[in-house]
């Protein structure tokens, strides 16, 4: 989860220093270990960042975690991301939920009818996946990432799941939208065709 945390830290801060350091560390390891790399897993984004390193940039853990969660959940002004915050009952730390496409801005801009924003979100989504595919190890795509699936808010209508925002990015695969992957003019088609290359 270290690299996943570094990637989303970079998205929220636009500072690649920590990510570059993490990639360099991974690349310097012996070839024997095999890693799985992912942008999103089935659980949350936990902020397993190297705060000892970040303190040299005057970044402190608590306020920084708050910023990351607020930016990526869309609470921070001018944020393009749409996620939700999950408070881990064991650690009482706030963690992040959301699909890659929604965290990359596609959900917000599509909802607003902002074509330029959607295009930017698609480029962001594809760039994040290109990074994932270029890293040493085995890239793992989350179900729905290949078509830019957005957050699934239907969990809130189910009393057995409503209190757990981790269902936000663990919804049912949208087979209807998946059909659009053959149409290069759609969000689904643009992402699918880019990842297929």
Language-model features and meaning:
Residues 1-197:
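Active-site and adjacent substrate-binding regions of carbohydrate-active enzymes
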């Amino acid at each position: 989860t270290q690299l996943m945390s570094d990637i989303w830290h970079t998205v929220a801060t636009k500072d690649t220093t920590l990510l570059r350091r993490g990639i360099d560390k991974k690349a310097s390891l012996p070839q024997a270990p095999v890693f799985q790399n992912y942008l999103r897993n089935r659980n949350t984004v936990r902020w397993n960042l190297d705060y000892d390193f970040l303190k040299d940039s005057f970044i402190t853990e608590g306020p920084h975690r708050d910023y990351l969660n607020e930016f990526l959940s869309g609470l921070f002004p001018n944020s393009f991301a749409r996620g939700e915050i999950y408070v881990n009952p064991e650690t009482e730390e706030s963690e992040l939920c959301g699909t890659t496409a929604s965290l990359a801005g596609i959900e917000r801009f599509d909802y607003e009818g902002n074509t330029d924003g959607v295009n930017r979100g698609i480029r962001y989504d594809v760039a994040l996946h290109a990074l994932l595919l270029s890293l040493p190890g085995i890239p793992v795509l989350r179900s729905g990432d290949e078509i830019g699936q957005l957050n699934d808010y239907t969990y809130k209508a189910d009393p057995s799941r409503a209190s757990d925002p981790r269902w936000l990015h663990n919804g049912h695969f949208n087979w209807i939208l998946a059909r659009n992957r053959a149409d290069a003019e759609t969000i689904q088609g643009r992402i699918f065709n880019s990842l297929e290359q």
